[in-house]
């Protein structure tokens, strides 16, 4: 299991948490894009191939940069063992997911599973993620996590389905932050999470 992350991002905690289930994790120390003088967006992919990574994750911007750089994964021997790709940090553009799927199709993996995730460092968890039993549609998250009361709301605070909306968690959950460091009276905390729709 490898998810490219700094130690300050929730994906670091999630990757290390994989050890609890007996997963072997592979850590990469360095720039995924090579150096300023010699950019190389295949570095992280080559690392994954050398270490027989079966689950490969990174921020959506990494996958976008690889597409923009014209990375050809068929030139890297050993990536066919990858069974799943994870993306988070920002929405993964549908064309980038289609690019990645085509790259793995060329490696003989036409049904590579994308686990697109939405969550946050401050909650140390995800609200929405993937399920390999559900359809995998570029530009969409597959499902809510168990126990997460998640809806998309329009500007008036009404739930919407099948259209763009604001991701809203409508009920408390175990890992929600209790306060912000140095925010003694909770003003910043309330403004950040509760101001847009009072009572939610």
State where each predicted segment sits.
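Conserved AMP-binding/adenylation subdomain of ANL enzymes
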Residues: 1, 7-54, 69
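Adenylate-forming
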Residues: 6, 29-32, 51-99, 115-122, ...
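Short, well-ordered coil/turn elements that cap or connect secondary structure elements
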Residues: 20, 50, 79-80, 109, ...
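Conserved phosphate-coordination/catalytic loops
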Residues: 35-39, 60, 199
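Alpha-helix initiation and N-capping motif
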Residues: 41, 60, 79, 174, ...
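Short, hinge-like loop/turn segments at secondary-structure boundaries
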Residues: 44-51, 73-76, 131-135
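Conserved AMP-binding/adenylate-forming
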Residues: 83-85, 92-200
């Amino acid at each position: 299991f490898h998810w490219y992350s700094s130690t300050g991002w929730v994906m670091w905690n999630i990757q290390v948490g994989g050890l609890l289930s007996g997963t072997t994790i592979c850590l990469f120390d360095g720039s995924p894009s090579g150096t300023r003088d010699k950019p190389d967006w295949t570095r992280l992919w080559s690392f994954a191939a050398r270490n027989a990574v079966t689950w490969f994750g990174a921020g959506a911007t990494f996958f976008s940069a690889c597409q923009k750089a014209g990375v050809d994964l068929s030139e890297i021997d050993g990536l066919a063992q990858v069974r799943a790709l994870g993306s988070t940090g920002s929405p993964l553009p549908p064309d980038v997911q289609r690019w990645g799927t085509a790259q793995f199709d060329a490696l003989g993996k036409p049904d590579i599973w994308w686990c697109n995730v939405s969550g946050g460092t401050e909650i140390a968890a995800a609200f929405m993620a993937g399920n390999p039993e559900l359809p995998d549609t570029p530009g969409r998250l597959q499902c809510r996590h168990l126990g997460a009361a998640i809806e998309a709301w329009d500007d008036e605070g009404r739930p919407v389905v099948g259209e763009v909306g604001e991701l809203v968690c409508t009920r408390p959950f175990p890992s929600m932050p209790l306060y912000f460091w140095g925010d003694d009276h909770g003003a910043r905390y309330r403004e950040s999470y509760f101001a847009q729709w009072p009572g939610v």
